[in-house]
Amino acid sequence: MSGHSKWSTIKRKKAKVDAQRGKIFTRLAREIIVAARQGGGDPESNVRLKAAIQRAKEANVPNENIMRAIQKGTGELGGANYEEIIYEGYGPGGAAVMIEIMTDNRNRTAGEIRHIFARNGGSLGETGCVAWMFEEKGLIVVEKKGSEPDEDSLMLLALEAGADDFKAEEDSYEITTAPGDLQKVRGALEGAGVKIALAEVAMIPQTTVKLEGDDAERMTRLVDALEEHDDVQNVYANYEIED
């Protein structure tokens, strides 16, 4: 992985999880359930729910699954009571790690996550130990291949729509926004015919640490193991591995 591009991480992960579509559906359903429980079942007045539904549709989750998840969140249907938790810790080489969890059994999940850290050369930390190294941002990714309009026009369009920053990566453009502006900027880009590869609220690292050798290999294994855990929704880390 070169740099700390979120999109390079997403692409690396995509091939691995494509064969686990059932797990993807489950994770997206949990996000919808929690979003509906916290902000109600109307996506027009619940920004988080609207974003979760969009991600589910992009992953080809059937509409009936989406509706059931909303109804579970609002209490119209019964189901597990999922709790949203953020875990923080350190990986090999001192890399900072944040994990978004949705679980119906906090104690079980905490033990399993702690074991994953220990097995891969890291340690689960206290709340707040690394959160200060990250900033919550809206993240929009546009792939360079076949991208319209050109880079300068896309940057101007994004910034005029309210984006905070625009960055050209090796094979993509990454646009960051305030979390509350994500849908507005996304709508402006899509309205101009821009094809969006990813749009989500993410924890963006403010600084990164370079890893190599054994530390790089162990960090990769740690992130993979965390992402494979059923209760993990997202993993964020501030490391980079040079190609």
From Swiss-Prot:
One of its GO terms (molecular function) is DNA binding. Its main location: cytoplasm. InterPro entries: Integrase-like_N, TACO1_YebC-like_2nd/3rd_dom, TACO1_YebC_N, Transcrip_reg_TACO1-like, Transcrip_reg_TACO1-like_dom3, YebC-like. Signal peptide: none annotated. GO terms for cellular component: cytosol. Keywords: Cytoplasm, DNA-binding, Transcription, Transcription regulation. GO terms for biological process: regulation of DNA-templated transcription. It is found in: Cytoplasm. Gene3D superfamilies: 1.10.10.200, 3.30.70.980. The keyword DNA damage does not apply. The keyword Transmembrane helix does not apply. Belongs to the TACO1 family. This is Probable transcriptional regulatory protein PTH_1024. It comes from Pelotomaculum thermopropionicum (strain DSM 13744 / JCM 10971 / SI).
